[in-house]
Amino acid sequence: MKILIKNGHVIDPDTKLDQVADVLLEDDKIQEVKENIKEEADRVIDAKGCYVMPGLIDMHVHLRDPGLTHKEDVVTGSKAAARGGVTTLVAMPNTKPVIDNPERLSYVKNKATQCNLVNVLQAGAITQGMKGEELSDIEGMVRAGAPAISEDGKSVMNAQIYKEAMQIAARLNIPVLAHCEDIHMVNGGCMNEDTNSEKFGLPGICNAVEDTIVARDILIAKDTGCHLHLCHCSTKDSEVMLRLAKEDGISVSGEVCPHHFTLTSDDIVEGDTNYKMNPPLRTKEDRQALLEGLKNDVFDVISTDHAPHTMVEKGVSMKSAPFGIVGLETSVSLTITELVDKGWITPMQMAEKMSYNPAKILHLANKGSLKPGKDADVVVIDPKESYVIDVKDFVSKGKNTPFQGKKVNGKVKVTICGGRVVYEDK
């Protein structure tokens, strides 16, 4: 099967190609990238006016499978990923039961293989049952295909156990994906601690909840030599510490989510639990630091922290509702609208942060690139097409987004995974 993508603006961070060209895919590999390819193909896609990028890689997704499949499952999550231009995703292990052994990891892997839409990589939990007490079978899970370990949803508060996990990760050459949150300081907080939390009469979450664990994790990573990836950074000091750590030669990377670079606590509509996520929406000053950090490549990655819940679960008070919003189907549009169109990052940086850099961090040698011989994972995006975000269009089970009704630019037109068209905008 040959697919020829014609006349698109090809953006490849691997080769630094940034021009109008054609891309020829044959079976599951990229065959050729150059101007005016004449070869016959089974399918020709006219990408005039569109970006043609390596398939996006989302390092931070909650598929809720097994055990929480009323919120999402491997199939619906994969469909949402494909609609969002994501051809590879990392699923977090905070499921029910927790993915803390090779057998449970294989369950997700097998389900994703049967689904056969996008590449689903399952991260393994750092500790058994995510209780923070005993290490999981990290080596067994890595042998079974885990690209990384994480305790996402919480931090491992026992620093010695965490250090031992980092030592294993360093030996196995896998990253640790860190959710930085000192649970002892949260105190039932449900939004950022600022004048808005006071106004709403809600308990707040201060920046130090994140910052103290960012500092700890960076220092343990320095000591162990493991690669630390900071998930969903939200504070100005996380940007400072990440920058200083990189200057110090520590192997560390960081991600920002679209909701944190788009919104602040000033945007929260009182009582609307679609604005409740963890870490919370911070201040304008914090958001500004995230934008500067994205622009200056302090932050390597844009991920979604896609966290679906049912409307019933979210339809309670701000204090009682679960944290989290969906993001797979809106991340491209928000990145183009809020970052590319406003001059914070270039289209090339977008491709780096949403594909090339995640591939490097996760050691996915054949992903994140449009070089001939690499995997035929490609996304075609119309950066100029405007539309209004509407949860009725979502294929995810989760409709919990604060972006309902927002007018955005940038639409995924075609997603190709392994040389197969897995999504097409009709």
Kindly label every feature range from the protein language model.
Residues 102-119, 167-178, 330, 334:
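Alpha-helix-loop-beta-strand connector modules within alpha/beta enzyme cores
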Residues 59-72, 95, 121-134, 203-207:
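Active-site mouth loops of central-metabolism enzymes
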Residues 135-302:
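Histidine/acidic residue-rich metal-binding segments in metalloenzymes
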Residues 1-55:
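Histidine-rich, glycine-flanked metal-binding segment
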Residues 8, 317-320, 341, 372-426:
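C-terminal cap of metal-dependent C-N hydrolases
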Residues 8, 23, 28, 49, ...:
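Divalent metal-coordination and catalytic microenvironments
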Residues 47-112:
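Metal-associated gating/positioning segment near the N- to mid-region
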Residues 199-227, 274, 295-296, 300-301, ...:
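His/Asp/Glu-enriched, well-ordered alpha-helical/loop segment
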